[in-house]
Regions:
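Peptidoglycan-targeting cell-wall enzymes and recognition modules
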Residues: 2-19, 40-119
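Short acidic/histidine-centered micro-motifs embedded in hydrophobic/aromatic stretches
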Residues: 37-41, 52, 130, 134
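Feature targets compositionally biased, intrinsically disordered low-complexity regions
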Residues: 24, 51-52, 78, 87, ...
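A charged, amphipathic interaction segment
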Residues: 93-163
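Short runs of predominantly hydrophobic/aromatic residues within well-ordered alpha helices
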Residues: 31-35, 68, 97-98, 124
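Extracellular cell-wall/glycan-interacting regions and their flexible linkers
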Residues: 1-36, 54-55, 145-183
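Generic structural signal of hydrophobic/aromatic residues within well-ordered alpha-helices
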Residues: 16, 76-84, 110-112, 127-128, ...
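Polar low-complexity intrinsically disordered regions enriched in Ser/Thr and small residues
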Residues: 55-56, 67-70, 82-84, 136-141, ...
Length: 183
């Protein structure tokens, strides 16, 4: 079930957000934002990216990490190839990597924390570190709160925005409507 959407997210970001909710059962918007922020930090949701920025196929990345979460260790990198071959997938694609990522032991262990609603940023972030074990923290926290601000709760009747920018836009549209300008 999808409870959260992101109208301003890219296609791949939206697909990941949907997958994390429907297939992984993550419901808390902060937990979703932490996972999304970490994928953004690692690859900007670009599946065929080799560490350093080169866009290459899976078999052509020979240095550093590869893919959505920059699989770096030999066992995790090779695991992507084995998993993809087993299921007839191309390891350079978004779908193959999302499926592999969510089946990895490290992700499954962190998932147990992300599935518990109402935890703090620090708790969800600690689970993300156990999942990825990054060397560079980067702007993960900034990305997290950016996603959190952009998520909108889906209700039966309407979408309730959590974004202050979208609220401002709605207010501006009302003002323009009053003076006869249709947006």
């Amino acid at each position: 079930m999808i409870e959260w959407i992101c109208a301003t997210c890219t296609f791949n970001e939206s697909r990941a957000l949907q997958y994390l909710q429907e297939r992984q059962g993550i419901r808390d918007p902060l937990a979703l934002s932490v996972v999304m922020a970490n994928i953004k930090q690692e690859s900007n949701f670009t599946p065929n990216i080799c560490e350093g920025g080169a866009r290459v196929e899976y078999q052509d990345c020979h240095v550093g990490g590869y893919g959505l979460i920059q699989w770096t260790s030999e066992s995790r990198y090779v695991g992507l190839g084995i998993f993809s071959a087993k299921y007839g997938l191309n390891p350079s694609t978004f779908d193959a990597q999302l499926r592999y990522m969510s089946n990895e032991y490290q992700f499954q262990r962190a998932l147990l924390d992300w599935q518990i609603p109402g935890r703090t940023y620090e708790e969800y972030h600690a689970a993300a570190y156990r999942w990825l074990g990054w060397g560079i923290e980067g702007p993960r926290k900034t990305y997290t709160y950016n996603y959190l601000d952009r998520l909108s709760k889906v209700s039966d009747e309407k979408v309730q925005s959590t974004s202050s920018d979208q609220k401002r836009l709605g207010y501006l549209e009302k003002i323009l409507g009053v003076i006869g300008i249709k947006v």
